[in-house]
A protein has these predicted regions:
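Conserved beta-strand
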Residues: 7-10, 17-27, 58
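Walker A (P-loop) phosphate-binding loop of ABC-type ATPase nucleotide-binding domains
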Residues: 37-41
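Helix-to-loop junction immediately C-terminal to a conserved catalytic motif
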Residues: 50
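Conserved ABC transporter NBD signature motif
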Residues: 58-66, 73-74
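Catalytic Walker B motif of ABC-type/P-loop ATPase nucleotide-binding domains
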Residues: 151-155, 160
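ABC transporter nucleotide-binding domain
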Residues: 167-247
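C-terminal coupling/interaction segments
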Residues: 235-272
Length: 272
């Protein structure tokens, strides 16, 4: 099966920061969580993938086609939802839909109308009248109305209340069933715990891990202690009210099952 997205050894250097040989892929019907703290390189990676900035090196393919030389054909099949979605605040939504539709050969007005109805977005309203969650749903509507096979989402749940975040994850899981691939950049770990098939963890511009959620959870356990245990590798030690916690490798048999949020927080604290 051809990957929807495959990038290898993507690099980009700025003063004080380097995106260093980033490689990742997204398969049809797969939600890939792209996680890292602010400034780790998530947005730089997405901008480099989509040609918003020019990488120094690396190769990127979408749908088996090199991005260079096929940008227009590829962008017809991609839906991009940037973080902090903003539109002309006083334009009617029907106007925004009309303008957006002109950029896509396969725009489906019926699909657009159905999605707007499903999400409860009246075309007579303006973006200034929509909540943050509704603005994200509008962005998804515009991304899906031209038959996108791949969605690239940059921090789509930031600033949303828990109910709106949960509704958005419901939508993404439904799209996954339809074979749409999703690259979901976020720093909200609980969202990925519910929805992601695989996690790509970026740290200081480098891919530190690329594993399924199950592999992360089977590799580590969470150990609570008051006195430092001898002869055990402690990963990402963190002070708690009554002692300390750290990750340990599962083969030690110590500790308890660790959730994805505990794993990622302790890995981020680790110096290794």
């Amino acid at each position: 099966m051809t990957a929807l997205l495959k990038t290898e050894n993507l690099s980009k250097t700025y003063p004080g920061f380097r995106l260093d040989n980033v490689s990742l892929r997204v398969e049809p019907g797969e939600i890939v969580g792209f996680i890292g703290r602010n400034g780790a390189g998530k947005s730089t990676t997405l901008k480099s993938l989509l040609g918003f900035v020019h990488p120094d090196s690396g190769e990127t393919e979408f749908f088996g086609m090199p991005f260079r030389g096929n940008e227009n054909a590829i962008k017809q099949q991609i839906g991009f939802v940037p973080g902090g979605v903003d539109y002309y605040p006083k334009s009617k939504i029907r106007t925004l839909v009309g303008v957006t539709s002109r950029f896509y050969k396969n725009w489906d007005e019926k699909v657009c109308d159905e999605l707007l109805d499903r999400f409860g977005i009246p075309q007579s309203k303006t973006p200034s009248e929509l909540s943050a969650g509704m603005k994200v749903k509008l962005a998804l509507t515009l991304a899906l109305s031209h038959g996108a096979k791949l969605l690239i989402l940059d921090e789509p749940t930031s600033g949303l209340d828990p109910v709106s975040r949960d509704e958005l994850l419901d939508i993404l899981l439904d799209l996954r069933k339809d074979g749409i691939g999703i690259l979901f950049s976020t720093h909200i770990i609980s969202d990925l715990e519910r929805a992601a098939d695989r996690i790509v963890y970026i740290r200081n511009g480098n891919i530190a891990a690329d594993r399924t959620v199950g592999e992360f959870e089977s590799d580590y356990r969470l150990l609570f202690y008051t006195g430092r245990p001898e002869g055990i590798e402690l990963i990402g030690e963190r002070a708690e009210r009554d002692g300390f916690t750290a990750l340990v490798k599962s083969e030690t048999g110590l500790g308890e099952k660790a959730g994805l949020e505990d794993i990622m927080l302790h890995l981020e604290r680790s110096t290794k």
